[in-house]
């Protein structure tokens, strides 16, 4: 009988997953040393040992169905920009993106348990890739898009450094819609809006900005009776910066995104609205590990 204590010990020694450790111990009739060898032979121990490294590089990949009715965006991380360009790594990211679009998974854990290559799960394929390439990798996040009237569009910038996906609703069917959607995606990539419209700005963020602007105005020595007007003016400016519909279009600074949609709606004969968007920037929010230079030199010198 394989005990929980034995599984725990094997996990601590190899860093491999719980189920992999249990299988290895079962295969070797509980022999700890042989189980370690089994995991090493399968590449699972080596892969798991790399899991302590920070994976802050990688790629953002998108998938849009041929009819443009559904799509997905995923971020998959690795340790170096060199591996981020590896064909197998990029191919894996593309297949995962397509899987997300065609599945009902809601969490990364559920995605990792989905079948990707025949009987192999995403996690198993990823583990094999880690062992083969020799770097830690992780599926970090994803979003799925689906629309009935309208379309889904995507845009990738900088070879996967930034990825955007947007969902536009429109009753009319026109090539113009795809063009508008591409422009909207490029806008999101370039201007990084936080909200769709002023109505979507959460009250907490708004109040925080108001406090900052009020303090700035008072510190500038402005009279109390005009401070409120100044604050409202600066809030309006803030919304133009962070709300997609209020932003100046990157292709024409005299026109806002809402104005662009208004013009194109007239052109296609039906209202065009943005119902959802997301922007992923590779590695954002991941704290990279900083190596101590002296330690690095010592390591290279074999000290």
Curated annotation (Swiss-Prot):
S-S pairs: none
Keywords, in A-Z order: Cytoplasm, Elongation factor, Protein biosynthesis
Stored InterPro entries: EF-Ts_dimer_sf, Transl_elong_EFTs/EF1B, Transl_elong_EFTs/EF1B_dimer, Transl_elong_Ts_CS, UBA-like_sf
Annotated CDD domains: UBA_EF-Ts
Gene Ontology molecular function: translation elongation factor activity
Chain residue ranges for the region called Involved in Mg(2+) ion dislocation from EF-Tu: 80-83
Family assignment from sequence similarity: Belongs to the EF-Ts family.
Job description of the protein: Associates with the EF-Tu.GDP complex and induces the exchange of GDP to GTP. It remains bound to the aminoacyl-tRNA.EF-Tu.GTP complex up to the GTP hydrolysis stage on the ribosome.
NCBIfam families membership: tsf
HAMAP family, per database record: EF_Ts
Protein name per its UniProtKB record: Elongation factor Ts
The organism of origin for this protein: Clostridium perfringens (strain SM101 / Type A)
Gene: tsf
